[in-house]
Amino acid sequence: MDLEKFFDTVCQSKLIEVLSRTIKDGRVISLIHKYLNAGVVANGKFERTEIEMPQGGSLSPLLSNIMLNELNKELKRRGHRFVCYADDCMIFCKSRKGAERTLKNIIPFIEGKLFLKVNRKKTEVAHISKVVNAQKRVP
């Protein structure tokens, strides 16, 4: 599963809400909010960042992991096995039908609760019927 233009679509208010659950010092939240709204210089031009998260910023990888941890917690709560790297995620299911159902059920959480967009062109259900132990093949 791929999240479409992740850094460009992170909802700042949702991120601040998630951070506020853990960070009780309003001054820290205020500093992070100012960081998110400070803007970026891209191709020699200043661009405002009023909605999204600045890509390439020093805090952005940490903040993106905090935001995506909400997805991880939800997948774990639902009992799924998964691997995520940045804005890409693989969810492992026992059957194709189960995988299709899982995808159908997790998209509303991602888009409705986290306000992120699933890239349906890059997201697919794949079925792996047999896994070969690579160590057994080594002579």
Which sequence ranges carry the predicted segments?
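Conserved polymerase palm-domain catalytic core
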Residues: 1-131
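Short, low-order "capping/linker" segments at domain edges
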Residues: 132-139
